[in-house]
UniProtKB/Swiss-Prot annotation:
Locations listed in the record: Cytoplasm
GO terms of molecular function: rRNA (guanine-N2-)-methyltransferase activity
Family: Belongs to the methyltransferase superfamily. RsmJ family.
Catalytic activity: guanosine(1516) in 16S rRNA + S-adenosyl-L-methionine = N(2)-methylguanosine(1516) in 16S rRNA + S-adenosyl-L-homocysteine + H(+)
InterPro entries, sorted: 16SrRNA_methylTrfase_J (IPR007536), SAM-dependent_MTases_sf (IPR029063)
Binding site for S-adenosyl-L-methionine: 101-102, 117-118, 153-154, 171
Gene Ontology annotations for the cellular component aspect, listed alphabetically: cytoplasm
SUPFAM superfamilies from the UniProt entry: S-adenosyl-L-methionine-dependent methyltransferases (SSF53335)
Keyword GTP-binding assigned: no
This protein's UniProt keywords: Cytoplasm, Methyltransferase, rRNA processing, S-adenosyl-L-methionine, Transferase
Name this protein carries in UniProt: Ribosomal RNA small subunit methyltransferase J
Length: 248
């Protein structure tokens, strides 16, 4: 995959070269999307729209840390969706990990979560965030145990992953409504990189074959069900819904 690779002053340019080799990234100085290694972390930037800011994964500070400390805990919709109960913490495969937010919430609540991400740039961002999280004195010990990353296509992972999880969680990228100029800046950068998950419909069947208890599909409230298959039940929130499917 081609992307502009930049090491900022003071950052380790050798580490950037190693990172490019590991994730199969080819440097293109003219690319709109740039992967930038700073002295602190790895960032994704859209060079023609610098005001959109940088995307990075940070499990230690910022919004994710705030959500862990002050969010709804077990009352969060995603926790209810995967079926967390008093003594039940499901093993989860998040087959469309993205920036790892929902996976992190579930791990913070005690679930073991295997994140699957096929895009090498997004996987590199996740891996960078995990490395820093693993080294943190407060969250590192449980994060290392509960949250892991697999860089692979979801189709491959859903076919080959062992042992099978209790729950497969799918949150495929869905095109935003055209009128939605309020789409988060971050989402605009992210969608410029990965686009819509046009093959997401193909994930439902292997997900149902793999999961032991349920498949959970997160959808915008205006989106049709994945693969056109009506959900067997659902949980609705203000702007999203979680569609539930039984294993087959």
């Amino acid at each position: 995959m081609s992307i502009c690779l930049i090491a900022e002053e003071g950052a380790d340019s050798g580490a950037l070269s190693s990172l490019a080799e590991r994730w199969g990234l080819v440097s293109d100085p003219n690319a709109v999307m740039a992967l930038v290694l700073t002295t602190e972390r790895l960032e994704l930037r859209k060079q023609d729209e610098p005001k959109l800011g940088a995307i990075f994964v940070d499990f230690v500070a910022g919004p994710m840390a705030h959500r862990r400390r002050f969010g709804g805990g077990r009352g969060e919709a995603v926790a209810k969706a995967v079926g967390i109960k008093k003594d039940y913490l499901p093993d989860v495969v998040d087959a469309t990990a993205g920036l790892g937010r929902d996976a992190f919430v579930l791990a913070a609540l005690g679930c073991h979560v295997r994140m699957v991400e096929r895009n090498p740039v997004v996987a590199a961002l996740l891996d960078d965030g995990l490395k820093r999280g693993y080294q943190d004195a407060e969250i590192g010990p449980w994060l290392r145990e509960r949250l892991t990353l697999l860089h692979a296509s979801s189709m491959t992972a859903l076919r080959d992953i062992t042992p099978p999880p209790d729950v497969v969680y799918l949150d495929p990228m869905f095109p935003h409504k055209q009128k939605s100029a309020l789409v988060k800046k971050e989402m605009r950068v992210f969608q410029s990189l990965v686009g819509a998950d046009d093959d997401a419909d193909a994930l439902l069947e292997p997900a149902r074959a793999l999961a032991k208890k349920r498949v959970v599909v997160k959808r915008p409230d205006y989106a049709p069900p994945l693969a056109g298959v009506p959900a067997q039940s659902m949980l609705e929130t203000k702007s999203h819904r979680f569609d539930f499917y039984l294993p087959v």
